[in-house]
Each structure stands twice: as structure tokens, then as C-alpha cells.
């Protein structure tokens, strides 16, 4: 019976043919990864390619090799470019071949890590234990893989909310309660959105002024807390940033931990970008205080170089973490003493998802394959390249730094030019791809150096490209 004649069942008629096709697909992607420099970083899909993608809903079967051929022709060459060594536009890692292979294994297992007793969950538990050790949270900490730090930060705000308002808030909902959270003006927008989604509201988040290094001003924070206390409000959460989205600034985490302890507020660190800097000896001292956080969010798909997506939440108090998410009334989620429904803690009791993919596997593979020292060396390398870029900018009379370089992000401008147009032209050229941001009302070129493949030649290409385009603008008047 052919695939076309089947009424049910999706396994192939011929496993050998599928195996051969699978090998071709794997070889194609390994070839693709190993030749990134030979192709444009980014190119816009043509109208014809978009049209070929926008077809009627397929009712009948197709040939896997034809779908693969379309992918290689119309999809693979037109990605966002973050794997390319010249990509510096947004804070995205470059992925790894090891991570890609691990994703293949995870897809083959098709494990749901929502709960129950199976080894894929043990892999996630092991990574949680490693992160608890790395960040000094201790063996009683809990953690969970998530899509990204946006969701991890949301969960951290929920945990802090329930800590302040009590478990009954899960039953009664948020009423007119006098609690307030604090973060710097450079905090990621997902913290602001989390205040909305947790029912607390944007008005209960104080965005505090930053200092010359774009880190939160501790005196301004203390003044805001004093004003809120005088108005009868209670601080419940202080958010520190380890690598701000615009400039890579790192807040004084130890100072924030002191203030949070004094005020009885939860201390959360958004470490999406910079938390893994603890692996780099030259960066780690600047993250002092991160080990005192009540919760920490980070992304392995940034400086950790894991393929998307691999967000992570670490929580010091596992019991408080579980109280925020567990729901014991669902009979279909009842734990058993033995059998498949047994096992230790279930991830679904520590987060919003019942259906969870095997995100932990690619991180587990990378940590075991490369080791922490190699990952730390990559982080040190990209931060050193950022300093190299800053030095190149400072040495050019046509360019200027727009912000201090705190980690791996360099914000600069071509003096008197349309810098947004320069960035767009660089994208179209396909060699390097920074992004733009706005600092103090000015448009700046923002180079976020994250990719483990980026080398000094890519820094040279960026500087030379900006200079050439800026000079061309000036010549046109």
C-alpha cells in the first residue's frame, strides 16, 4: 500500500528511502553551516519566493524530497542572518552544529517535558542543578526552561507578586493592593508587559533614572522607595539588569540586593544578555551580587549560543516557585507513587505550560560537549571584540561613541549622517548587519556582538562599511 493510498498512519513505506533522504537533509544543513561566510548575511525574499510559499492548504500527499528542495531554495537562504559572523543587529546567538544535532535527537524522541517519570526530565533537572551551582543559588533552588526571558521574567514577577500578596491572590485575583516594583529606565520592555499580564498594572512599576553608565541610579531608587513608603505603598520587587538591551549596561547588583533585603522586597535579575558572563573571568566580577537574587532569568540562545529557543528561569525558593504555579485539582495531573505518573517534581508545577518540548537537551549537549571554559572563552572573546570596535570608533574623527561600552554592545554614529539609512544600506549589502537604537534623542548604530563566529575581520568590515556609506552621504550633500 502506497503512502497516497493510506487512510491512517504516517510512518514511511520504505525506511531505507527515508534514511537516505534524512542523510541528504543533514548533509545540506552541515554544508550550510560550514559555508556561512560564502553567502550574504541577509537578502530579502523575492515576490516570486513569497508567492511560492503562499499556496492553498495541501490536502493530498507530497514528496518529502520536493518539500526539502523548496526549503533549500526558498527558505534556508533567506533567514534572519543571526548565524552569520557579520550579524550584530540584535542580541541573538549564532547557534552551533552540536545544538542542531541535539534538536534532531529531541525531535526524534518527541518527549513532552510537562511531567511524569522519564529520563528527558532528568536531563532538565541536571541542567537546573548545574545552573543553581553556577550562580550560587544552592541545592534547594528550582528552575525551568522556557521560550525565552520574556516568559521567564513574567513568571518571576508572578512569584514575587504571590510572595507579597499571599497565595489567596491566585483565587481572588489582584485587587487594589498597595505594592510597587522598581527597575531602571533601561529595563527590557517585557518587565513592563509582565506588570500588565500579572494584573498589577504598569502604574505599579517605577522606572528609575540611570547614571552615566546607563545603570540604575541607587540614590534615585532609594528616593523613589522613600516617596512610595510615605504614600503608604510597599515595595515588593526590585529588578536588576545584567546587560541592558540598548547598551549592555550592568546594574550594581550587590547594591540592589542590599536595598531589596532592607526593604523586604524580592530581588530579581533579568540576565537575558549578561548573566552567563559569570563564565568569563574578565566579566564575572562585574556581576557580583547576582548570587543574591531571589530569581534569575537568562537566555541560553544569546551568549550561550544554543539554537532558538532556550530561555531559563532559576528560583532560589523552590517551594515559593511551586506555590505560584501548581494546581492540584486536575485529576489528569495527579502524581502516582510508581509507574509513568511517578517521579520527582513535574515541570508543569513550576510554570505555565503542560506541553513542553525538550529544550534542555541542546543545552545539556553543549555544556557536556564544549564545557563551561570554552563557553566562557567565547563570551570573553565577543566582549573583547566590542572593545576593539569601540577603539576603532574612538580613533576615527568621522565616528563617535554614543554610549559607554558595558559588555558586548557598541552604540556609535557617523557624525552628521542619516545613520538609520547607513544601517539599512549595510543590511542590503549583506556583509554585516548592525541595528539602530535611540539614545538621548539620537539615532545610533548599535552593534551587538554575540556570535561565536565573529572575528576581527568582521569588525573591520563594519567600520569600513559605515565610513564608506557615511562619506557617500556627505558627498551627495
Enumerate the language-model features and the residues they cover:
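N-terminal entrance/gating region of PLP-dependent enzymes' catalytic architecture
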Residues: 2-140, 432, 448, 454, ...
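PLP-dependent enzyme catalytic core of the Aspartate aminotransferase-like
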Residues: 439-477
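Active-site C-terminal subdomain of aminotransferase-like
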Residues: 263, 288-394
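Conserved PLP-binding catalytic core of the aspartate aminotransferase-like
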Residues: 400-426
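A common structural junction motif
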Residues: 333, 427-434, 467-474
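Short Gly/Ser/Thr- and Asp/Glu-enriched loop/turn motifs at secondary-structure junctions
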Residues: 139-140, 176, 403-408, 438-444
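Conserved PLP-enzyme active-site core in the AAT-like
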Residues: 119, 148-323
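A short linear hydrophobic-aromatic micro-motif
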Residues: 141, 397-401, 431-436
